[in-house]
């Protein structure tokens, strides 16, 4: 899975999948990382990775334009600057204005980036990708809801107030250990004003 040394095969993999799902209602995730939740292969420095990602975005949107809708700006799309991809984004990666930027937490419950006024004004808007379960480096938390519901509430309220309102995605892993955090997140996504009015203690 290497767009530097194996681009034709990777492109065909993407193309085949886009053709398979073109008639369905989808949100297409743009971009590329590596295998096993790691950084992309074939590009070592942030500058090299940025150049590859720019090519990836162009080629992926070309596929969407070809197989889904000639007006690519009308297709729901998301770009997720997760982990090392945030460094590439901060190095000046240009993401098309119609693409939703999905910001992430640091795997400990704290959101790493809030949209600037310029990012808030984007046509694609802003979203969040948040974890209540995590498998990966530096360590995992899979079987216990390990952080306070008040932290989740505080971070989601902050996200909403700073313009992260287009799309909320929650990584839940196994449902049972984090049932309450999941319920709180979904209730805030559905009607944040009601949760804010009653407070977390009453919501519990």
Residue positions per predicted region:
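Structured mid-domain segments that build the active-site/substrate or prosthetic-cofactor binding neighborhood
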Residues: 103-109, 115-204
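Gly/Pro-rich turn-and-neighbor structural signature
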Residues: 2-123
